């Protein structure tokens, strides 16, 4: 990545660490994400059958589900297993619900690859076309003289060598221009270097050649023939489909893509994607580093362990896995803290469906009603799973004597009623509801929470949050999750909310809240500790996944030999360990708040608000300091 883009990324990270709220980076924001709409009646396309009817034992699937649920680095959201176009296992891990679309992240790169395949089959593009020729009007004199031979195939295989990558998108609105003017490492075609902007440029090429957004180009060619109606794909500030990320898709619709590819591009007997493109895209054209994947990379498609198998792979656990020789397709959505193929979740799947799978396959196993019921019950347990409520302790941790088991309802309701009408003003407003990772992914930045209130009305418990000038009331599930809407700068997101009351070792009342972003990989958690007879509270926030990913990206920037001398002095003067600590405190912040009565705004608080505003301005100025 060029120095300008790196510095902009560092400025944004410093803004987070110094408590800046509101829009950051140099990319314009305009609300675009659509509300999902009705999820009460999820659409199903594939028939549901007993696994044994497709030659796979229910016991095998039960064991795999249990391993996935127990895996330390895996946070499963959805799992679909199909064979021969029949669903043999479906599980939506609580609080995630059936029929809701989910962010695909890089999984959608494979769909962008399909779009390129369509355009090539229509004679409007070729693999060996020079990318700079496609955008001839954008080329300056220097590019015309010195440009390398960068082809469409180099983009498809992640071998472009172009140094404008994902982190650079915060630096401005014209990503095509930034890509075309970026330096190239080595010679295109020599080395695999994973870069989402290669896929973005494929989308830009499709728009350049067709005059329409890629998502619109795909509707009559892919989405409509497959019956995919609930689909949303983000655009960049210039109105180009992002291509390498930004797609929301339901698991059942993702399965249609896998079934089609397993069948050589056919769906319901009709050729959708050209068979030649399916074969070419699922053949090895590049060798990634082993830490990313061990089996090779095709045209925007990863190879898998079993010979002939493939993966549409997205970070944090979004996958469509296809096994053409067995007719098996597996769809996963998750919030795991891992990238690429080398991960705990896929290791578990490979254990059951990888290279060794197939020896026990039969046209139809003898049905085992007991094993099947065990599978059904396991799915039900995982779909209704809820953490066991904590013990209510008496006398502090050292002198603990178990109180009555906090099983529900009476105790939880008592605590909720006790909090009714209590409102608090934050003493630091740099923390928002929207997870930091999602703020960056969607270029949608929080204004920070100013107030929080608690209300119990007609048997329902609510938390009220004020961010900026907007107040939103969220219902909290005390005995199971509740599905509510959260609006972040006019973009709608579905939340699964749960709450649990307990006491800490000091005898203080604690409220643990979890906000699962049901369309995303992220969860937001906060532990609220009530102190001094409810006059003060302390809020301890965290999000998953997030910390490790952000710190890894930060470390790569700070240790870059080319960029280090250009960094703001605040970064050069701090050790890497100190920067890690600051970032960890940013992702897992602790905030204090004091109680205010309804409508109360004292002169002292107004002065404090002015001080907070002045501090935010100073933080912004500090964040923008460069040598």
Task: Give the residues covered by each predicted segment.
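N-terminal leader/targeting segments and the immediately adjacent pre-domain N-terminus
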Residues: 1-97, 120-125, 366-412, 416-429, ...
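Structural helix-adjacent loops and short alpha-helical linkers that scaffold large soluble proteins
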Residues: 57, 123-127, 164-166, 207-219, ...
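Active-site SXXK
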Residues: 85, 103-128, 155, 202-206, ...
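Active-site helix/loop module of the DD-peptidase/beta-lactamase fold
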Residues: 122-160, 181, 212-245, 249
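A small/polar active-site loop signature that marks catalytic segments
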Residues: 160-235
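Active-site-proximal alpha-helical segments within enzyme catalytic domains
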Residues: 198-205, 243-266, 318-335
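Active-site Gly/Thr loop motif
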Residues: 278-333
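Substrate-recognition/cap regions that form aromatic- and gly/pro-loop-enriched pockets
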Residues: 430-544, 552-559
């Amino acid at each position: 990545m060029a120095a300008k883009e790196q510095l902009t990324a560092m400025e944004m990270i410093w803004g987070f660490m110094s408590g800046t709220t509101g829009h950051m980076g140099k990319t314009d924001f305009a609300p675009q994400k659509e509300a999902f709409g009705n999820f009460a009646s999820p659409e199903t396309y594939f028939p549901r059958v007993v696994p044994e009817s497709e030659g796979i034992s229910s016991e095998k699937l039960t064991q795999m589900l249990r391993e996935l649920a127990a895996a330390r680095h895996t946070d499963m959201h959805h799992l679909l297993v199909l064979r021969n176009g029949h669903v043999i296992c479906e599980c939506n891990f609580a609080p995630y619900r059936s029929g809701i679309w989910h962010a695909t992240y890089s999984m959608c790169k494979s769909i962008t690859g399909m779009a390129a395949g369509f355009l090539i089959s229509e004679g409007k593009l070729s693999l060996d076309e020079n990318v700079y020729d496609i955008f001839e009007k954008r080329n300056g004199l220097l590019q015309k003289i010195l440009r390398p031979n960068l082809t469409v195939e180099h983009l498809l295989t992640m071998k472009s060598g172009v140094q404008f990558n994902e982190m650079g998108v915060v630096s401005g609105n014209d990503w095509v221009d930034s890509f075309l003017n970026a330096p190239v490492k080595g010679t295109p075609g020599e080395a695999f270097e994973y870069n989402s902007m290669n896929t973005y440029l494929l989308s830009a090429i499709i728009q350049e050649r067709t005059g329409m957004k890629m998502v619109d180009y795909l509707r009559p060619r892919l989405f409509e023939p497959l019956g995919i109606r609930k689909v949303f794909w983000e655009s960049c500030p210039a109105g180009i489909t992002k291509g390498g990320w930004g797609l929301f898709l339901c698991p059942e619709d993702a399965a249609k893509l896998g079934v089609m590819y397993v069948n050589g591009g056919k769906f319901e007997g009709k050729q959708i994607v050209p068979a030649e493109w399916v074969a070419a895209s699922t053949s090895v054209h590049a060798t990634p580093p082993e830490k990313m994947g061990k089996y090779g990379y095709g045209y925007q498609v990863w190879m898998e362990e079993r010979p002939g198998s493939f993966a549409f792979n997205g970070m944090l656990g979004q996958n469509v896995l296809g096994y053409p020789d067995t007719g098996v397709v597996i769809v996963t959505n998750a919030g795991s803290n891992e990238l690429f193929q080398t991960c705990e979740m896929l290791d578990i799947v490979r254990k059951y469906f990888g290279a060794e799978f197939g020896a026990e396959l039969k046209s139809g196993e003898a049905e085992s009603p007991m094993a099947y019921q065990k599978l059904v019950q396991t799915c039900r347990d995982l779909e209704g799973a809820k953490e066991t409520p904590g013990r209510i302790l008496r006398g502090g941790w050292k002198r603990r004597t178990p109180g009555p088991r906090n099983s529900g309802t009476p105790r939880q309701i008592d605590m909720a009623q006790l909090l009714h009408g209590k409102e608090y003003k934050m003493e630091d407003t740099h923390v928002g509801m929207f997870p930091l990772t999602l703020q960056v992914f969607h270029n949608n930045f929080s204004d920070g929470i100013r107030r929080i209130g608690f209300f119990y009305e007609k048997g329902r418990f609510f938390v009220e949050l004020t961010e900026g000038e907007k107040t939103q009331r969220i219902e909290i599930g005390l005995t199971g999750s509740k599905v509510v809407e959260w609006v972040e700068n006019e973009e709608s997101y579905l939340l699964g909310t749960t709450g649990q009351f307990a006491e800490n070792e000091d005898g203080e009342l604690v409220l643990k809240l979890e906000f699962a972003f049901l369309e995303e990989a992220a969860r937001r958690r906060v532990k609220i500790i009530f102190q001094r007879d409810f006059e003060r509270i302390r809020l301890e926030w965290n999000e998953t996944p997030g910390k490790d990913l952000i710190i890894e990206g930060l470390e790569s920037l700070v240790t870059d030999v080319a960029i280090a001398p250009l960094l703001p002095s605040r970064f050069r003067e701090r050790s890497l360990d100190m920067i890690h600590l600051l970032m960890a405190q940013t992702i897992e912040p602790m905030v204090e708040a004091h109680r205010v009565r309804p409508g109360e705004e004292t002169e002292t608080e107004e002065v404090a608000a002015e001080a907070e505003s002045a501090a935010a301005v100073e933080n912004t100025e500090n964040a923008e300091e460069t040598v």
